[in-house]
């Protein structure tokens, strides 16, 4: 018994000594060895994550804009039903919890290591995110955001955030040319061609001045003229795109529109209005139509179980305005009208699908077979056309016409049209659909169709009676070139009120058009300083145009 007590006592004493000696190390033991901190973080990996998160963020913003501007179908009968407080939760969290937080973490690491190119890319993306957030919501948290000591940041004025983004763009240009610079970032966009990054920055400045032209025409005019004089914006081959792959396994590297539609059919409905503009409006097919859309059927259905609207009269506002309804023509271009709330009939392998551009689906060579096979077409190796060289010409055309900046608006417009028509084909030929495209449309035939199209558009511009009519021609052609980029389409519509004659909603009174979105639910329930907007009709600071229904 005495021996047992001795052993027990010795064990307790030893344990106490051990515990005492470890007490000083307790804080160290509580640290997670797998947690990323400033000492262990890789600036390269951080920048990788920032770039990947940005493409996802941009896609969410772009997709909503495309639906609102009739580039693809917008479901729901009313705008307020289509876009509730929770509709943009992902955009908000991706911006703040991912991209902006990671950039804030990256910046001091990059400064300490003199990673100038990392800083240039990060600040360019930061500026784009800030501008996109203002374009989406107007006032958002900025100066008090991403602060571990402040869980309830207040919003900043949208105009002030825009100005801060312009400062970031100027700083980014300096980082792209600074010497010396260490490090070789993994650049998903330009493969470390920093001359192109500088041209992108200048192009983003052009967009900044164009968006703010209604706030300060003189500042915008001077800013754009300076950029024209410098002559260093995006040119052919400088297109700022995110390139997808063909891997279906997790993580799926394919274009999201392809993955959604070509796996088992179904997916988005195309916009009846947009397809009509590309296939019927001019009396001949837009050369891009077969690249944008793939018809799973070459004829319209006669079965109302597949397409209910074929047995129904158009709404009164369609009849009075002479708008396309239900189907754009008779050749199997099968989509839906704006704000169509109907359910989903068995038409997944009949409705018009996404084509080869930009989501790397199939080129429409009249084969008219279902798209329920992920090995079809370009297999999803598509792109996000975030900022193309052709867009520069359209923006300069608008600026020349509305601000009187240097240059001829018609020449800019026709240059943009030709540049985009050629880009759509040249890019599509790089996909696995290249041989199909060349066999169906030889290069000489496509060139002839491009020439004819440009001639027609130029004549339409010349025939436009007023400046606003001429602006409508420019904007319509820009809008048609923006397939895959609803962000710029949404801004164009709010900024100019054009294209005119957008297809109306099926409901006669769908509510006010979305000028900015409601603040998301995940912000409203976590920030005590958050104040929700009264409705979707609140306008971004640079949109000083009349209230809706100026646009609808």
Locate predicted features.
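Terminal processing/anchoring signals of secreted or surface-associated proteins
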Residues: 12, 22-24, 50, 127, ...
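Sec-dependent bacterial lipoprotein signal peptides
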Residues: 1-20
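Beta-strand acidic-aromatic groove motif in beta-rich domains, primarily in extracellular
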Residues: 59-67, 138-140, 221, 488-491
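C-terminal functional modules
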Residues: 420-552
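Structured, solvent-exposed acidic/aromatic patches
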Residues: 71-428, 464-469
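Short, compositionally biased low-complexity segments
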Residues: 20-29, 71-79, 134-142, 434-451
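Membrane-proximal, proline-rich intrinsically disordered regions
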Residues: 22-69, 75-78, 86, 90, ...
């Amino acid at each position: 018994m005495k021996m047992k007590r001795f052993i027990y006592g010795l064990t307790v004493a030893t344990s106490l000594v051990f515990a005492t000696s470890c007490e000083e190390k307790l804080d160290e033991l509580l640290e997670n060895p797998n947690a990323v901190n400033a000492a262990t973080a890789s600036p390269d990996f951080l920048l990788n994550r920032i770039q990947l998160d940005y493409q996802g963020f941009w896609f969410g913003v772009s997709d909503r804009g495309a639906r609102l501007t009739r580039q693809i179908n917008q479901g729901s009968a009313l705008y307020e039903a289509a876009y509730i407080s929770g509709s943009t939760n992902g955009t908000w969290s991706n911006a703040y919890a991912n991209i902006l937080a990671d950039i804030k973490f990256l910046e001091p690491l990059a400064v300490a290591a003199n990673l100038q190119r990392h800083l240039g890319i990060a600040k360019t993306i930061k500026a784009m995110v800030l501008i996109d957030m203002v374009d989406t919501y107007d006032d958002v948290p900025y100066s008090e955001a991403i602060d571990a000591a402040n869980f309830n940041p207040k919003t900043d004025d949208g105009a002030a955030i825009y100005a801060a983004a312009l400062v970031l763009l100027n700083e980014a240009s300096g980082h792209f040319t600074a010497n010396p610079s260490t490090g070789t970032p993994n650049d998903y966009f330009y493969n470390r061609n920093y001359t192109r990054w500088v041209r992108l920055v200048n192009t983003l400045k052009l967009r900044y001045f164009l968006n703010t032209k209604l706030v300060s025409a003189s500042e915008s005019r001077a800013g754009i003229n300076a950029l024209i004089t410098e002559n260093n914006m995006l040119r052919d081959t400088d297109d700022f795109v995110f390139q997808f792959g063909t891997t279906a396994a997790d993580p799926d590297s394919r274009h999201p529109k392809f993955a959604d539609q070509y796996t088992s059919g179904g997916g988005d409905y195309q916009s009846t209005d947009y397809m009509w503009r590309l296939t019927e409006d001019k009396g001949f097919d837009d050369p891009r139509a077969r690249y944008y859309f793939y018809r799973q059927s070459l004829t319209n259905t006669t079965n109302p179980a597949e397409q209910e609207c074929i047995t129904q009269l158009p709404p009164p506002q369609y009849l009075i305005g002479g708008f396309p309804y239900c189907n754009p023509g008779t050749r199997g271009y099968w989509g839906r009208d704006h704000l169509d709330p109907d359910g989903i009939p068995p038409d997944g392998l009949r409705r018009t699908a996404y084509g080869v551009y930009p989501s790397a689906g199939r080129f429409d060579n009249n084969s008219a077979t279902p798209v329920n096979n992920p090995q079809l077409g370009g297999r999803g190796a598509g792109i996000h056309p975030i900022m193309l060289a052709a867009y520069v010409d359209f923006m300069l055309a608008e600026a020349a016409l509305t601000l009187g900046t240097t240059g001829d608006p018609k020449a800019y417009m026709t240059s943009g049209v030709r540049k985009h028509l050629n880009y759509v084909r040249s890019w599509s030929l790089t996909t696995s659909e290249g041989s199909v495209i060349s066999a169906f449309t030889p290069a000489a035939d496509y060139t002839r169709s491009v020439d004819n199209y440009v001639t027609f558009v130029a004549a339409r511009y010349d025939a436009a009676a007023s400046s606003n009519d001429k602006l409508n021609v420019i904007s319509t052609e820009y809008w048609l070139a923006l397939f895959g980029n609803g962000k710029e389409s949404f801004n164009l519509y709010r900024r100019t009120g054009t294209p005119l004659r957008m297809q109306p909603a099926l409901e006669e009174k769908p509510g006010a058009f979305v000028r900015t979105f409601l603040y998301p639910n995940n912000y409203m329930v976590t920030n005590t300083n958050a104040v929700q907007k009264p409705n979707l009709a609140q306008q971004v600071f640079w949109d000083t145009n009349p209230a809706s229904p100026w646009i609808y």
